[in-house]
């Protein structure tokens, strides 16, 4: 009798224990199903401990949940496209120039380095920076997501340094084009004056930008002076001529510039193009010209340098010292300028 009673009592206790475990597990499952993703993993761990044979599945769920949370945490907005214009001309190739010894580029004067392949073009602009025209040129280039080489005049950089900084900010290559656009091949200029024009031009660009430009130089009017060329070689400055002169400074309108460039380019097949961001008609012509280049299958090559140009400290200092700063006056405008008749 006692044995039977003991067996009955053990059965009741066992049933109660099983019911308690079942209820706790069921509650955990309901809680797990309703819980947000961020806390399901801990609940799954609790469920795994309570359910024999479920440890492997729970561990797998934990890994999947953790991976999902990590993936959500690392998702970032898609990167902005490098170019907003899907049909842009763009830049097909960037070349790095070693300027040691002063290499020359442009078949107008130099025949040694024929690095452009068929349909490749380098865009170059002289004589800036200048209000309205240079910003218009920059916009046209930016709209086509393409790059150029700029050869600014030193004096112009002191007049409009903020525009030259826009050129740099847009990612274009910047060289120099003398201090005052002097003809260095003129008999009126001696070797020392020519060197001063070169060095002062580079220092002016550096002063405007806040950093040294590329060691790229173009002679004004493409007037190459032998002594000056030798000097450029000692300073490891690359000399730029051109393959194709747009003669934009002679053009009566934008259409003439476009026709001149495309006619020559279709005949030659490639080349370094010389233009002027100083010229109004060039700024007007550029959007259409870039579209014509794209339609004609031409590709843009950007030229860069391995190392920035090392300006001469004494020239930098002299240029800063010689810069004329307007004298501020405490007098009001009305006491200086008065309208007496209108």
Where are these predicted regions, by residue range?
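Alpha-helical scaffold elements lining the catalytic groove of polysaccharide deacetylases
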Residues: 133, 182-209, 223-269, 282
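Catalytic grooves of carbohydrate-active enzymes
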Residues: 262, 266-304
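Short low-complexity, flexible loop/linker segments enriched in glycine and/or proline
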Residues: 164-167, 189-192, 255-258, 315-319
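Active-site-proximal beta-strand/loop segments in catalytic clefts of secreted hydrolases
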Residues: 125-128, 151-155, 178-179, 218-222, ...
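N-terminal pre-catalytic segment of deacetylase/amide-hydrolase enzymes
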Residues: 2-123, 130-136, 143, 292, ...
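A short acidic, amphipathic alpha-helical/loop segment
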Residues: 136-137, 162-163, 228-231, 285-289
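Residue-level detector of anion-binding/catalytic polar loops
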Residues: 147, 173, 238, 245, ...
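Active-site beta->alpha N-cap acidic-glycine motif
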Residues: 79, 83-189, 197-204, 213-214, ...
């Amino acid at each position: 009798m006692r044995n039977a009673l003991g067996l009955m009592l053990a059965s009741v206790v066992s049933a109660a224990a099983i019911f308690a475990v079942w209820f706790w597990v069921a509650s955990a499952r309901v809680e797990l199903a309703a819980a947000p993703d961020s806390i399901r993993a801990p609940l799954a761990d609790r469920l795994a401990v309570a359910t024999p044979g479920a440890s492997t599945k729970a561990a797998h769920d934990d890994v999947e949940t953790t991976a999902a949370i990590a993936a959500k945490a690392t998702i970032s907005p898609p990167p902005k496209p490098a170019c907003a214009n899907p049909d842009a001309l763009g830049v097909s190739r960037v070349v790095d120039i070693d300027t040691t010894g002063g290499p020359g580029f442009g078949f107008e004067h130099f025949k040694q380095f024929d690095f452009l392949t068929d349909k490749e073009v380098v865009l170059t602009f002289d004589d800036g920076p200048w209000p309205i025209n240079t910003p218009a040129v920059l916009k046209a280039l930016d709209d086509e997501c393409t790059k150029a080489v700029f050869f600014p005049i030193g004096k112009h950089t002191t007049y409009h340094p903020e525009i030259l900084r826009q050129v740099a900010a847009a990612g274009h290559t910047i060289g120099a084009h003398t201090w005052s656009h002097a003809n260095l091949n003129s008999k009126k200029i001696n070797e020392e004056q020519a060197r001063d024009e070169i060095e002062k031009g580079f220092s002016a660009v550096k002063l405007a930008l806040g950093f040294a430009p590329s060691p790229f130089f173009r002679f004004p009017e493409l007037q190459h002076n032998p002594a000056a060329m030798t000097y450029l070689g000692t300073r490891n400055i690359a000399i730029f001529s051109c393959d194709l002169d747009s003669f934009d400074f002679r053009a009566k309108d934008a259409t003439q510039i476009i026709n001149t460039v495309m006619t020559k380019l279709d005949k030659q097949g490639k080349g370094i193009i010389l233009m002027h961001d100083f010229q109004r008609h060039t700024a007007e012509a550029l959007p259409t010209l870039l579209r014509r280049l794209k339609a004609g299958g031409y590709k843009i090559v950007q030229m860069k340098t391995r190392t920035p140009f090392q300006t001469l400290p004494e020239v930098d200092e002299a240029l800063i010292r010689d810069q004329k700063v307007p004298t501020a006056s405490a007098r009001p405008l009305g006491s200086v300028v008065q309208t007496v008749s209108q």
